[in-house]
Amino acid sequence: MSVLDRFKDTSKYDRVMRELGMLIVLNRAQRQEPGLFLKKKDADRCGWDGDPSDFPEADERVETFGSDGAEEEGIFFKSPRLVILRGAYKDDITFVENSKERNMIEGLYHEVNHLYDRWKENHPGQPSPYRRRRLVLCYLVDKNGVPVHKKPLYISMHGGASKVFCQRYAQFLEQLEGAYAKATNDKSAQGFGERMCASVIWTPTFGAEQYGETQKSPIAVPQSWLIPTEKSIFSFW
């Protein structure tokens, strides 16, 4: 019996929930290319034990962040292999953050969305500081579908990047549901529930697209992915 085994008794040695690591969406025009980036500190936070070679297009690199151009080491993913646990469906919980208060979370979107109207009434003609923030909980997995870190990561998005990400993920799920129905000889394709969706492997390849109604700007979005078919269905689990 190892000395470590004593700590498995959580009634004596309780555990705590720590802050989760984040996958950053690289979408600014000056970036080398769009995709997801895992900072080294977030790799440590999630218990990373993978390697860039576990993924179709990934490598170790240095990226700059913030107005001071701080450099961060990490891993870049052009085509991350994702298992999405929660947050990427359009009806999943989102939050309202206040950009004037250092991105402080004001509350759940469906509970505090009146803040937008109140701002328009009190500050006519001024841009709203409120943004709808989406957090997508996920795992990065190897080619066998095994997570390469011990704790889940989250992807934080807002605006067009969030909207398009959800649309493309929903499109992928619908393709997979159709392929599943063919593979199982079901008469009709039915939508997957939460638990089934949380077991699916999605491998999007990110690219840049112009987004905006009046003034367009580049955003990083999933542009393509492995299309599910009756023959390839098993590779998505």
Task: Give residue spans per PLM region.
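Extended, charge-rich, solvent-exposed interface segments
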Residues: 230-237
